[in-house]
From Swiss-Prot:
GO biological process, one term: regulation of cell shape
Residues involved in ATP binding: 128-134
Broadest EC class assigned to this enzyme: ligase
Protein's pathway: Cell wall biogenesis; peptidoglycan biosynthesis
The family this protein is said to belong to: Belongs to the MurCDEF family.
Name of protein: UDP-N-acetylmuramate--L-alanine ligase
């Protein structure tokens, strides 16, 4: 028996297999959340297949691991499956879903399958409107540095691992908990993190913010009585909920009453430095290889979780300093020398006004001498409508703004909640003259005339703007360019 097989055998003695399940089929397998769970399952030894409308990096990776991937949804493809996994993005008339129901094959949500993976493990679930992916990644990195060998399922690419999911050989499972469809209520972790709570995905909660808050309380009460809730006390809504949580609480933040507190924050380009204060131990100096106060909060959450699990401080400090980032989370795609001077290209997934504001703040703090050029793609008409005034306020804070049309994500257009309307409203404020861009081709043709020496170019949004950012290669900009570095200053 090989060393890996021996580890797998030991894991099986801790984590029982799902009874009678051998073949698992994923409808929409190419999504980050679905693909991450699928990767863990295929590595656990299950026969795995699934479908999506197009090939992508996730489907290619799963195919390389032995999964059978179908492009397109056809009813016969679910034949032989013992269970079918779907996400809330799959419509009720999907032919594979209908066939599974007709054949009485069990159909479960993505979160139910994640809950099954977590059921026999020491689960750490990270919830919140913003910061889930980064916080989950930091926790996974700390546990990896401490040789706890965790399983993790993350909504973004963890650069150090080259994947967003990994099967470890220990009892630990670290995962994001999705509040967008309330599916995080399926999870029963040992540790729950709440980073912040804002009005987002309000259709799920019938437009009722109180219902959203009470759902977070229900999520925290899924913890066993011996579990731990790790909560950001800097967030006013989270602070408001603290008295309603009937579990052990560990708070974190910049606030003086935080159990895990950051002081003396300084940002130096991509790095964040701060003093860590916890009761009963000496203060420590910490360096996080991520920019911005919002990422210090994410690091504090990881520190709080690790401290509760008695992970050595040396491992925590090393993991945070060595952190290699996550795909599309303030990801520097390069520092380039052009015939107009050096420019920095950064790509970020944030698509809520608070997330965009945090990214802008980090960019200005780390590179105060640079002109900030943002290429923003709004995500969903409903979000643009519901947070319209906030978007106008936040997007007005950059030096130059190019607005791509809304990435619909399956929604129908909403009059007055599109990028042309945003352009008009921002222009009326008199601070900025934004440029509406109809598509990526027009963007690539416009940029050479817009950019100046020393610019920091920030592509921002949750749609296909990430793919567009990759297109902003040396030749695409129409300059005589040569890469000058790896991206980090």
């Amino acid at each position: 028996m090989s060393k890996n097989q021996e580890k797998y055998s030991q894991l099986r003695s801790i984590i029982p297999e799902m009874r009678r399940v051998k073949h698992i089929y994923f409808v929409g397998i190419g999504g980050a959340g679905m693909g991450g769970i699928a990767e863990v399952l295929v590595n656990e030894g299950y026969k795995l297949s699934g479908s999506d409308i197009a090939e992508n990096a996730v489907t290619q990776r799963l195919a390389s691991l032995g999964a059978k991937i179908h492009i397109g949804h056809r009813e016969e493809q679910v034949h032989g499956a013992d269970v079918v996994v779907v996400s809330t993005a799959i419509s009720a008339d999907n032919p594979e879903l209908l066939e599974a129901q007709a054949l009485r094959i069990p159909v479960v949500q993505r979160a139910e399958m994640l809950a099954e993976l977590m059921r026999y493990r020491h689960g750490v679930a990270v919830a919140g409107t913003h910061g889930k992916t980064t916080t989950t990644s930091l926790i996974a990195s700390v546990y990896g540095q401490a040789e706890r060998d965790p399983t993790f399922v993350i909504g973004g690419l963890l650069n150090s691992a080259g994947t967003n999911a990994r099967l470890g050989h220990s009892r630990y499972l670290i995962a994001e908990a999705d509040e967008s469809d309330a599916s995080f209520l399926h999870l029963q972790p040992m540790v729950s993190v709440v980073t912040n709570i804002e009005a987002d995905h309000m259709d799920t909660y019938e437009g009722d913010f109180e219902k959203l808050k009470s759902t977070f309380i229900d999520f925290l009460h899924n913890l066993p009585f011996y579990g731990v809730a790790v909560m950001c006390i800097d967030d006013p809504v989270v602070r408001e909920l603290l008295p309603k949580v009937g579990r052990k609480i560990v708070t974190y933040g910049f606030s003086e009453d935080a159990d895990v507190q950051a002081l003396n924050f300084v940002q130096e380009a991509y790095l964040s430095r701060f003093t860590l204060r916890r009761a009963g131990v000496e203060d420590m100096e910490v360096v996080v290889n991520l920019p911005g106060q919002h990422n210090v909060l994410n690091a504090l959450a990881a520190i709080a979780v690790a401290t509760e699990d008695e992970i050595d401080d040396a491992a925590i400090i090393q993991a945070l300093a060595d952190f290699q980032g996550i795909g599309r989370r303030f990801e520097q795609l390069g520092c380039f020398d052009t015939n107009k001077g050096e420019m920095v290209l950064v790509d970020d997934y944030g698509h809520h006004p608070s997330e965009v504001a945090a990214t802008i703040k980090a960019a200005k703090a780390g590179w105060p001498e640079k002109r900030l050029v943002m290429v923003y793609q709004p995500h969903r008409y409903s979000r643009t409508r519901d947070l319209y005034d906030d978007f106008v306020e936040v997007l007005s804070q950059v030096d130059c703004l190019l607005l791509l049309d809304v990435y619909a994500a399956g929604e129908s257009p909403v009059p007055g909640a599109d990028s042309r309307a945003l352009c008009r409203s921002i222009r009326q404020r008199g601070q900025l003259d934004p440029i509406f861009v109809s598509d990526s081709e027009q963007l690539l043709s416009l940029l050479p005339d817009v950019l100046q020496a020393g610019d920091l170019v920030l592509t921002q949004g949750a749609g296909n703007i990430g793919a567009i950012a990759k297109q902003l290669s040396l030749s695409s900009l129409g300059f005589d360019l040569a890469a000058s570095g790896t991206g980090k200053e």
